Curated annotation (Swiss-Prot):
Binds 1 zinc ion per subunit. This is Methionine--tRNA ligase. It comes from Corynebacterium efficiens (strain DSM 44549 / YS-314 / AJ 12310 / JCM 11189 / NBRC 100395). Keywords: Aminoacyl-tRNA synthetase, ATP-binding, Cytoplasm, Ligase, Metal-binding, Nucleotide-binding, Protein biosynthesis, Zinc. It is an enzyme of class 6 (ligase). Zn(2+) binds at C147, C150, C160, C163. It catalyses: tRNA(Met) + L-methionine + ATP = L-methionyl-tRNA(Met) + AMP + diphosphate. The gene is metG. It comes from the Bacteria. Pfam families: Anticodon_1, tRNA-synt_1g.
Length: 613
C-alpha cells in the first residue's frame, strides 16, 4: 500500500530569553518535539518545525537591570546562548528565530487588528498590578498569593495550579511580588481584553472533538471553560510590540501582552521560514490547508496558552465567535491538531531553578557527555506523563546498562566479528527459526513503535526498540558466533548468524535515529554506508529584514543581525523502513559507540553539578 505524504507542523514552545537552557527546559519542549519531527521526516512527510526565543515582558527588564545592560543586549546575549544550546543538542528546527524581529511584530499586529476589527478585542478599565518600588507592571505570573476559590497557597496571578481556575492578580488573597516580595499596588488602567466568553462556544465545540489528546491535557483544557472571562492582552510596559490601534500605537508606555505575541510566533516563524527559503507563500501549506496536522509541544505550565488563548485568537481572527466577523488577510488559520504537554523534570524533588542553584545547564551537560546520552535519558525516563526526578545515579545506570552494555555492545560485537571474519556483509544461507524470529521481531517493531510515535508515546516506542536490542543480544549469546568462527565447517552458519545480527543492528539503528541522531550517523558509517543519514541543524547568521513592516514606536532595528537555527533535512537518507544488508558491502572497523561512565559519578555527579540532597 502506498502511503500518502502528509504536511506536519511541529510548533515548539518558545524558551524565554532570560538565561541559558537547563535540562529541565529541554525535557519538556526540546527533545520530545525533535524526536517527533525526525520521525515524521523519516516517514516521508513534509515537516515544518519552528520556534524561537521569547524576548518580551517584565522578567526580561528585571534581568537586564540585574546585569546592568539594555534589554536588547540581554535578549541578544541569551538568544545566542540558547541557539547554541539547542543546536548542540541536535534539535532539528527548520527555523528557530526570535520575537524581536520586524516580521514577528508585523504578523502579531495583523492578528490583533483582525481580532479588533471582528469585535473580539474589547476596551475596558481594569486593575493593573504595579511594583511600588519601580513603577513597573508586574506580570500575572510574578504575583503569588492565596487562591480565593480553593484557598491554596502559591496561586499565581493568572491561575491556581491546585484547582485549575483562571485568576486575576487582584483576586488573590495577600498577593506579593515574586520579584522582590513587596505587596503590589493595584491601579486603574485602560486595556484591550480578548473576549473569551464570545468565543467560548466555538472553543468548547473544538475541544470536545479532541478526544485523542492526552487525558490530562484535555481535562485541564475543558476545566478552563467553566470560569471563562475576558483576558487582558495589553500591558503598561515600554518593552514589547506596539498596539496597532490609532491613539495607542505611538504610546510607548503600553504594549501587547507577551503571551499574546508569543503564541503568534508559531505563525510568524513559519512566514519567516518561507521567505528565507525563497518561497514566500510556502507557509500557507502548513496554516491554510485543513488537511495539515499541527502539533504543539510544551511543558504543562503552558497548556492554558495553547489550548485556550491561541485557539481563541485563531477563531476570533476567522470571525468564528458569537460576534461573527470576517476572515483576515492571512486566511483561515488551522487550529492545533494536538497539544502535547510534558510534566516537569525535577532534581531531588525540586523544580529546576537557576536562582536557587538547582540547575544543570545544557551547555555543561553536552561538554561532559555529548548530546545523545541526554536525549536518551529524557526519552526513556523523562517527564512524559508524570513529574520525574533526575538523579545522577539513574542517569549513569541508564547510560551504562542500556546504552553501553545494551546498544553499544550489540553494535560493536556484531560489526567487529563480521569485520574480522569477513571484512564485509557476509552471504547468508538458509535461516533457522531463531534467525527468522529475531528478524520478524525487528520488522514488526517498525509498525508498533511507529504507531506509538505517531501518538507522541515516546517512552512506549523506545521501550519496544530497546526490547529488540535486548533480544538481539540474547540471540547472539545463544548462537555463540565466536565458537562458530573457530570451526571451519561452520563458516556458512557463522555468515548467516552475523548477517542476521547485522540486519537487526541496521533495523534498530533506523528506529533509534529520531532519539539518537548523532549515534545513528556513526552506526550508519560503520555499516559501510555513505552520506548523511541523520541531518544536523546549523547556526546561520541573518539580518532582520522583512517584507512585512510593523507600525508604532519602539520597533526592531531593521539592520540588526542575529543567529537562527536552520537545516537541510531533505538531504538525509534516513527512512522509517528496513534497509536490507547487502552481502558484499564493506564494513568499517567499529570504534566504541558509547562511553561507559564511572559508577562513582552516580553518587556525586560531576564537579560542576549541584550537590544532590
Amino acid at each position: 500500500m502506498v502511503r500518502m505524504t502528509k504536511n506536519v507542523l511541529v510548533s515548539v514552545a518558545w524558551p524565554y530569553a532570560n538565561g541559558p537552557r537547563h535540562i529541565g527546559h529541554v525535557a519538556g519542549f526540546g527533545v520530545p518535539s525533535d524526536v517527533f519531527a525526525r520521525f515524521q521526516r523519516m516517514r516521508g512527510n513534509n515537516v515544518l518545525m519552528v520556534s524561537g526565543t521569547d524576548e518580551h515582558g517584565t522578567p526580561l527588564l528585571v534581568q537586564a537591570d540585574k546585569e546592568g545592560v539594555s534589554v536588547q543586549e540581554l535578549a541578544d546575549k541569551y538568544n545566542r546562548q540558547i541557539v547554541e544550546d539547542l543546536t548542540g543538542l541536535g534539535l532539528s528546527y527548520d527555523l528557530f528565530t526570535r520575537t524581536t524581529t520586524s516580521n514577528h511584530y508585523a504578523v502579531v499586529q495583523e492578528l490583533f487588528r483582525g481580532l479588533h476589527d471582528n469585535g473580539y478585542m474589547i476596551k475596558e478599565t481594569t486593575l493593573g498590578a504595579i511594583s511600588p518600588s519601580t513603577g513597573r507592571t508586574l506580570p500575572d505570573r510574578y504575583i503569588e498569593g492565596t487562591c480565593p476559590i480553593c484557598h491554596a497557597d502559591g496561586a499565581r496571578g493568572d491561575q491556581c495550579d491546585n484547582c485549575g481556575n483562571q485568576l486575576d492578580p487582584a483576586d488573590l488573597i495577600n498577593p506579593v511580588s515574586k520579584i522582590n516580595g513587596e505587596t503590589p499596588e493595584f491601579v486603574e488602567t485602560e486595556h484591550f481584553l480578548l473576549d473569551l466568553p464570545a468565543l467560548a462556544d466555538s472553543l468548547t465545540a473544538w475541544l470536545k472533538g479532541r478526544e485523542d489528546w492526552r487525558p490530562n491535557v484535555l481535562k485541564f483544557s475543558l476545566n478552563l471553560l467553566e470560569d471563562i472571562r475576558p483576558r487582558a492582552m495589553t500591558r503598561d510596559i515600554d518593552w514589547g510590540i506596539p498596539i496597532p490601534v490609532e491613539g495607542w500605537q505611538d504610546n510607548n508606555a503600553k504594549k501587547l501582552y507577551v503571551w499574546f505575541d508569543a503564541v503568534v510566533g508559531y505563525l510568524s516563524a513559519s512566514i519567516e521560514w518561507a521567505w528565507r527559503t525563497g518561497d514566500p507563500e510556502a507557509w500557507r501549506t502548513f496554516w491554510n490547508d485543513p488537511e495539515t496536522s499541527s502539533y504543539y509541544f510544551m511543558g504543562k505550565d503552558n497548556i492554558t496558552f495553547h489550548s485556550q488563548i491561541w485557539p481563541a485568537e485563531l477563531l476570533g481572527y476567522a470571525g468564528r465567535g458569537s460576534r461573527g466577523g470576517e476572515v483576515g488577510d492571512l486566511g483561515e488559520l488551522n487550529l492545533p491538531t494536538e497539544v502535547v504537554s510534558s510534566e516537569f523534570l525535577t532534581m531531588s524533588g525540586s523544580k529546576f531553578s537557576s536562582s536557587k542553584g538547582v540547575v544543570i545547564y545544557v551547555k555543561d551537560f553536552l561538554a561532559e557527555f555529548g548530546p545523545d546520552p541526554l536525549r536518551y535519558f529524557i526519552a526513556v525516563a523523562g517527564p512524559e506523563n508524570n513529574d520525574t526526578d533526575f538523579t545522577w545515579d539513574e542517569f549513569v545506570r541508564r547510560v551504562n546498562n542500556e546504552l553501553a552494555n545494551g546498544w553499544g555492545n550489540l553494535v560493536n560485537r556484531t560489526v567487529s566479528m563480521a569485520h574480522k571474519n569477513f571484512g564485509e556483509v557476509p552471504v547468508p544461507s538458509a535461516l533457522t527459526d531463531s534467525d527468522q524470529r529475531i528478524l520478524d521481531l525487528a520488522a514488526s517493531t517498525f509498525d508498533s513503535a511507529g504507531a506509538d510515535l505517531e501518538l507522541s508515546k515516546f517512552k512506549n516506542a523506545i521501550t519496544q526498540i530497546m526490547h529488540v536490542v535486548g533480544e538481539a543480544n540474547a540471540y547472539i549469546a545463544e548462537q555463540e558466533p565466536w565458537k562458530l568462527a573457530k570451526d571451519e565447517t561452520q563458516r556458512e552458519r557463522l555468515a548467516t548468524v552475523l548477517w542476521t545480527a547485522l540486519q537487526v543492528v541496521s533495523d534498530c539503528n533506523t528506529m533509534l535515529t529520531p532519539y539518537l541522531p548523532h549515534t545513528a550517523q556513526k552506526v550508519h558509517e560503520t555499516l559501510g554506508r555513505e552520506g548523511i543519514w541523520a541531518a544536523s541543524p546549523q547556526i546561520v547568521e541573518v539580518t532582520n529584514e522583512s517584507p512585512r513592516q510593523p507600525v508604532g514606536v519602539g520597533l526592531p532595528d531593521p539592520e540588526h543581525t542575529y543567529p537562527v537555527i536552520m537545516g537541510d533535512y531533505q538531504a538525509q537518507a534516513a527512512k522509517w523502513e528496513r534497509i536490507d544488508m547487502v552481502p558484499g558491502t564493506p564494513l568499517n572497523k567499529p570504534a566504541p559507540l558509547v562511553t561507559k561512565l564511572d559508577p562513582e559519578l552516580g553518587e556525586t555527579g560531576p564537579e560542576w553539578a549541584p550537590v544532590q540532597s
